[in-house]
Amino acid sequence: MQRYNNNLNKKNKNEKNDGFTCFLREIMVILQTDTVLFLFCKKNEGRTVRTDKNYNNRNMKKIWVMMLATLMVSSTMMAGNVKKSTTLPIEGEIVKASHPMIQYVGRVSFAKNPDVASFNYPGTTIEASFQGSSLKMLCRPKTGYFMAQIDGCEPFKVGFNAERDSVVTLAAALPKGVHHAKVMYVIEGLFRKPEFRGFVLDKGCQLVEAPALPERKIEFIGNSITCGYGVESINMSDPFEDETENHWLTYANIVSDSLKAQHTSISRSGIGVYRNYNGPKTGDADNMPWQYEYTLFDQHDEKWDFAKYQPQLVCINLGTNDLSTKNYDIQLYEKNYRMFIKTVRSKYPHAKIVMLTGPMLGEKESSKQRTVLDRICADANKTDKNIYRFDFSFQKGDLGYGASWHPSMLQHRKMAAELLPFLRKLMNWN
């Protein structure tokens, strides 16, 4: 016993005497002896009683495994006494999100910090051209998922999900020269509070002027279908998850890309034009017409400046949530939709506006919706000839379903294939 006590009391004068260090020292001493010491602490006497028992070498391996497991548990319990690790400093040229050569498409706010871009609508896009052979992206930890594309090549998904996950490599080992990066936020960031903080370039490199964004501009106003809810899932019974939502794969992005147009997506799962999903029959106050006025969804301290983005085309896909459960009032739906059309027209006086019906509603509710929108369009056309109608075909399951019966990736491609010819002709965008 004397050898145990002497070894236990030998401490480096620079060593920190916290609980975890003492525990580790005890384990190391035990492993160096031929004796395993079982420690029993009597709660009421405040002292330690030690009893010895010799074990042969064959049993020692089992004991070591048990002690190692104990060490792991103890280290977790004593985590408060252990200093957190420090990451290596970021090497390279840091370019802030406020850099004038970074291009944004979508509703982005710099109100809280002039060097940090805040956003939470899917489809928000960041583009830049840069010198060098690598590119890193800086975001607030847990910002969520992006699709990234370098020099127009195959897009790939990146994520910021851990507590300290703030730097992600987008490109490495590129040929030296000038390259272009496009990054799109592909989920709904309402609860994540996403922030883009900048890029990291190779030492001595900088951003250069990027190619001009397309002159063609579209705005999609919609619900979970336009967001891309569950599009990466292949099981209709799957719940909502950020991991399976992806706006890049939606009809909205496919159509915009095919038309060589930039687009914004003002969309949110569960939103309605008068009543959100399964809301009261009288309607919800926080519906799309109310949220539409603000830069960020459900954050109402900053009104959006509609002069920043004036689309030539607006596509509205709302009504699935209003009518998807039986507790709805079709007259209130029509009344609010008429008012919302007037709001959109006031923001975009020269845009063509297309009212869409989606593929998810049942036949009865879909028929009611189409009748209402046809009537709104006909009435509007008496004074405004730039209001139009379009119906997607119903999803039948032959192309599969995404999560919660939402359109699958193949269904979104079909939707894009249906909508594209109509919009090409309407806009004369060949």
Model region roles, listed by residue range:
Residues 226, 260, 264, 319, ...:
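Sec-exported extracytoplasmic/periplasmic mature domains
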Residues 30, 35, 40, 49, ...:
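N-terminal secretory targeting modules
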Residues 14-18, 44:
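Acidic/polar hotspots within intrinsically disordered regions
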Residues 4-5, 26-30, 42, 47-50, ...:
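Short, positively charged and aromatic/hydrophobic N-terminal segments
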Residues 217-221, 226, 263-267, 312-317, ...:
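Structural recognition of the beta-strand scaffold that forms the well-ordered cores
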Residues 352-357, 365-402, 411-430:
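Extracellular serine-dependent O-acyl
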Residues 123, 190-191, 231, 237-335, ...:
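Conserved SGNH/GDSL esterase-like catalytic core that processes O-acyl groups on lipids
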